[in-house]
Amino acid sequence: MPTTTFEKHVWAEIDLDALRSNFRAVKERAGGLPLCAVVKADSYGHGAVQCSRVFAEEGAAWLAVSCLAEALQLRNAGRTLPILILGHVEPEYASALIEQHITAACYSLPQAKALSAAAERAGGTVDIHLKADTGMGRIGFALRTDFDRAIAEMLEVCTLPGLRMTGLFQHFAVADDTDAGNVAYTEEQYQLFLRAYRALKAAGQEPPLVHCDNSAGVMLHPDWPSSAVSALCMARPGIILYGFDPSDEVRFGKFRPVMKLKTVVSMVKELQPGQSTSYGRRFTAETPTRVATLCTGYADGYPRLLSCGKGIVEVHGVPCPVLGRVCMDQLMVDVTAVPDVQEGDEAILWGGTVSDSAEDIARKTDTISYEVLCGVSRRVPRVYLEHGRIIAVEDWIL
């Protein structure tokens, strides 16, 4: 529902100026190489409709999603850039791929044959990018297992009716790891990818477009594969567009976090010594303690693992530890050190000056920033800001 108003309960502020800044930083690092902006998982929880608009305005060459539904959402929103589906598409939807000019990943001969037959029944041609598995071990033609067979299958795909091969790509498994063994593994993946490209070219099926770099790849190896192939190349950044480094080992410090998660204080009360708060009575006051209840919980994406002092929330510029267990829809913080806190005051769950960052939360909960961002649920409105002004709100409930 398009609007610029929303209920101040819990919301995610999306800084589109930061998003633009990040895109430009990646573009500069890539040396002018075309960029395929990854907007899967609703732009890592930020909202793909608005984020894709910004990327298009900034000169993105492609958009990448995970599934057909995500691609159709973008088309329905008026996005006209080429779209690549990185994952699986049921062959029965070939007509949608054709009609909406959406490119599918092709990762096995049986999948390609099924898609070919469906495309013929639909009376059109599906554009495909061949997916090479150089060591990720997910979908893709298994080059490490049997290179010659994988190439033969790719070449057979190129002859199937109803399909048009327009690209070749792969995905690095450990480009974000600086361990010597993993650095060598990334190099092996890259060389195997180049070998596959050259084999296809030698057989008369040179891919018109080639892409292999993810976020870590484009920052560490911006000349891959453009320095080694004659085809058009592009980079495929993801997490760095949203302001986060690929890993603790690979950090650049050039990006601005785009999301800030906020809520409000619903009640303030004083706990006396011996009184407790939340389920399980995991926190019992030893001294008089002022407690603020906040309008958010793990159902919104604030991890329950941040219970009992692990999470730090910002209220009036003061860091406030979480008290007791995080509930489904509410959590409590210690605001004893916060002067004049009252109901309706804003609290920053992550992304503030003294609150946790999404990366802090990832470390504390033994995960990655990607999961923290994607975990913000759909009942949390996304509030889009440009130049400090709200320009749009996406609320999936209203």
Protein language model features and the residues they cover:
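Active-site anion/phosphate-binding pocket segments in diverse small-molecule metabolic enzymes
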Residues: P2-R20, R24, A69-E70, V89, ...
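Active-site-proximal beta-alpha core segment in soluble small-molecule metabolic enzymes
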Residues: T3-F6, V10-E13, A18-S21, G31-L209, ...
